[in-house]
Amino acid sequence: GLAGLSGGFVALDASRPWLVYWIIHALDLLEALDEDDDIKRRCISTLRACKSSGAFGGGPRQLAHLAPTYAATLALCCIGSNEAFEAIDRPALYAFLLSMKDASNGFRMHDDGEVDVRGTYTAIAVAALTNVLTPQLVEGVAEYAASCQTYEGGFGGEPGVEAHGGYGFCAIATLCILDACHLVDLDALDAWVARRQTNIEGGYQGRANKLVDACYSFWQGGTAQLSAHARRGDPHHVEAPQGVRWRPGVSTAQVPATTPIQEIVDPIKLQRYILLCAQVFPDGGLRDKPGKGRDYYHTCYALSGLSASQHPDCTSPHVVAGSPANLLPRTHPAFNCRPEKVSRMLDHFSGLPDL
C-alpha cells in the first residue's frame, strides 16, 4: 500500500494520513518497520504535504481536521525520528486545537463541524503527545467525556445517544490521559464491554444486537485494557511494564492490581476469531468477517486488538492462542502505538519550551 494504491482508492483521497497510519502501525506491530528508512522518509513527505492551518487535512490543500491530524501524529509517532517530530508545527497545532474547543468543552472535528467524543479524544491525544495539555485546553473536557456514559454502561458519541464501541474507547482513553476516570462507572463499563463479546464467534460487536467485526477487537478490547489501567481506588499499585506512559511528565503509569481482564472477557476466543476468521489466507491481511475483503483499516485494528488481548493488563503474563510465534509486541492502550515510540515522542516534546 505504501508503494502505491489502485485507482479504486480515490474514494479515500481525504484519508491519506489514515492510510499512512494504518499501514505504518500494522508494520510496526509485525516488527517490519524500523529497518526500512526509505518508507519512513516517504511517509513523512506525504504527511508534510497534508499540513493545513497548523494541523493536518485529509490530503494536500484540504481542510484541517482533527481526525487526520490524529492519524498523522500517530504515524509520526510510529516512525519515531527527529525528522518525523519536526514535521509538527507545535505552536500552530496548539492554536488549531484551541480553536476547535466548543462551549460544551467537547471539540469540533473541523471548522463549523460536529462536536463529539471523537473530536475530544483526538484533540486530547494529540495534545498529550506534543506536550500542549494546558489548563485552558483541558478545562471541562473530562466532564464532557464522562457525560457521554449511558445507562448501558458504555459511551455514546455525545450525551444522550446509544453506547458504541468506538466512542467508548475515545471517552475512556480521554479520561485515562486526563487522570479522571473517577468521574465514570467503570464496573458498568466493564459489564457493557463483556456483553459485546459474542458467544459463538468470540469477537466483538460494536453495539448491542450488531454483528461481530474484527476492528472492535481493539475498540472494545482496548477499552477493557484501559478500564483495568484506570482503577486507582485499590491501594495495591504496580508499575506498568515497558514504560507505558500517558502524558508528558509522567514517567510510568501507576495502575492497581485489579480483576484480570481475562475474568471479564475471553482473550483466547477473541484471538481465535482474529487469527482464524478475520485473517485472509493465503494472501495476508485482515478483514471485518468471513465473506468480506481485506483492507488496511481492519488489518491495523485487528492486529492492535490481537496485541491488546495478548497483553491483557499489567499484572498478567502473556496470553497467546496457538503458536508462541503469534505473539505481537505491546501496543499502548490509549494511543495505539508501541509504548517505546510513545515515550520517545513524549521525551522529544517535553524537552521543548512550554507554550
Task: Give the residues covered by each predicted segment.
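Positions within ordered alpha-helical repeat solenoids
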Residues: 29-32, 49, 61-62, 78-81, ...
